[in-house]
UniProtKB/Swiss-Prot annotation:
It comes from Salmonella typhimurium (strain LT2 / SGSC1412 / ATCC 700720). This is N-acetylneuraminate epimerase. It comes from the Bacteria. Keywords: Carbohydrate metabolism, Isomerase, Kelch repeat, Periplasm, Repeat, Signal. The keyword Repeat applies. Pfam families: NANM (PF24996). SUPFAM superfamilies: Kelch motif (SSF117281). One of its GO terms (molecular function) is racemase and epimerase activity, acting on carbohydrates and derivatives. It is found in: Periplasm. Homodimer. InterPro entries: Kelch-typ_b-propeller, NANM, NanM_proteobact. Kelch repeats lie at residues 51-95, 97-149, 151-186, 187-232, 235-284, 306-355, 357-386. The active site is at 241 (proton acceptor). The lineage of its organism: Bacteria, Pseudomonadati, Pseudomonadota, Gammaproteobacteria, Enterobacterales.
Length: 386
């Protein structure tokens, strides 16, 4: 999840491959204009007609769309979101409507941050939003979701609503008492991962029936801020946080068949060049291009994993957060280091169209939102970054 809120700031040797990385300005990849306003911790999805929708996060209640099939591609503003400004929502298209699940925000300027469990949907035909008459079985912040078919979405992971909300209530209560606030922060972070009770239940929401189903549990610990991808009926749940500040390098893999999820053998990202171990990523970009699953960017706290192994529960205390620019590819069943992005970036929106993976917005190494749109494309054995 990355813990981007203001009070959370206290929170391989390079292989010679037949694949290479290149920065290209050729016609191999689609060039998209910048988003009208910088976007981090937002959400987005693409419909069946090649139209991308992004919004929320640092864009507040604003949403934008861009039609990839048009010769002249420009972002257009759509009707603002009625549910209030929020971050870390998940969105997918179901039955030709854009569904938005959960997030974290404030009910008003005086209230503390809190986890949402509501669902909204947007009609592109009518340009209208509607609150869906449902609530999720658990609060949804730091969760991830993938579309299973035209009526169902799989949602899993995320923070524990009660523990998360209590932290911000306590922070607000401490107010200007810096000593008390530091005590709240330390007590919150100085716990083992199991004490945060991150969600490990897998839920399936059916938009046609407006129902939720328990589809089992993750094969390991619950995570927050994971990246997820669905391809050829295989779900990949990539890294994420085990607790605030501590990532995992594990990638869960499952097969979706006959409305059943079957978990397969886990894999792990390799260490970055020059580093002894892979800390794991939160807020990474991901998507498929010509059959290769690409994962790039995100952020972590180098050294937090070793601290935690040594018994230091506040594992990222005193460690500067590092935004990443490495790109990894899953090639013939093995993860490989592929190269670097144009800049370190995380917590943006990943959208796949054809064999291009668009990286929309994100947070740079200064913690600032960006409005740029870049892309990954595998072409003739090369990873093209545009």
């Amino acid at each position: 999840m990355g813990m981007q809120m203001k009070n959370f700031k206290k929170m391989m040797t390079l292989m010679a491959l037949c694949f290479s990385v290149a920065i290209t300005t050729s016609g191999y990849a689609t060039t998209l204009p910048d988003i009208p306003e910088p976007l981090k911790n937002g959400t987005g999805a693409i419909d069946n007609n090649g139209v991308i929708y992004v919004g929320l996060g640092t864009a507040g209640t604003s949403w934008y769309k861009i039609d990839l099939k048009k010769q002249h591609k420009d972002w257009e503003r759509i009707k603002s979101f009625p549910g209030g400004a929020r971050e870390q929502s998940v969105s997918v298209f179901l039955n030709d409507e854009l569904y938005v699940f959960g997030g974290v925000g404030k009910k008003n300027s005086e209230s503390p941050l809190q986890v949402y469990s509501d669902v909204y949907k947007y009609s592109p035909v009518k340009n209208t939003w509607q609150k869906v008459d449902t609530i999720s079985p658990v609060g949804l912040t730091g969760h991830t979701g993938v579309k299973l078919n035209e009526t169902m979405v799989l949602i899993t992971g995320g923070v524990n609503e009660h523990i998360f909300d209590k932290y911000f209530i306590d922070i607000a209560a401490a107010a200007a008492d810096e000593s008390e606030k530091n005590k709240v922060i330390y007590n919150y972070f100085n716990k083992p991962a199991k004490d945060y009770f991150f969600n490990k239940i897998v839920f399936i929401y059916n938009a046609k029936e407006n129902t939720w189903k328990n589809a089992g549990e993750l094969p390991g610990a619950g995570t927050a801020g994971s990246s997820s991808v669905m391809g050829n009926n295989f779900l990949m749940l990539i890294n994420g946080e085990l607790k605030p500040g501590l990532r995992t390098d594990v990638i869960y893999r499952a097969m979706w068949d006959n409305d059943k999820l079957t978990w397969l053998k886990n894999s792990q990202l390799p260490p970055s060049p020059g580093e002894q171990q892979q800390e794991g990523l939160a807020g990474a970009f991901s998507g498929y291009s010509h059959g290769v699953l690409l994962v790039g960017g995100g952020a972590n706290f180098p050294g937090a994993k070793q601290n935690y192994t040594n018994g230091k529960f506040y594992s990222h205390e005193g460690i500067n957060k590092k935004w990443r620019d490495e790109v990894y590819g899953l090639i013939n069943g093995h993860w490989q280091y592929m190269g670097k992005m144009k800049q370190p970036l995380g917590y943006g929106v990943s959208v796949s169209y054809g064999d291009e993976v668009f990286l929309i917005g994100g947070e740079n190494a200064k913690g600032k939102p960006v409005s740029s749109v870049t892309s990954f494309t595998m072409r003739d054995g090369n990873l093209l970054i545009k």
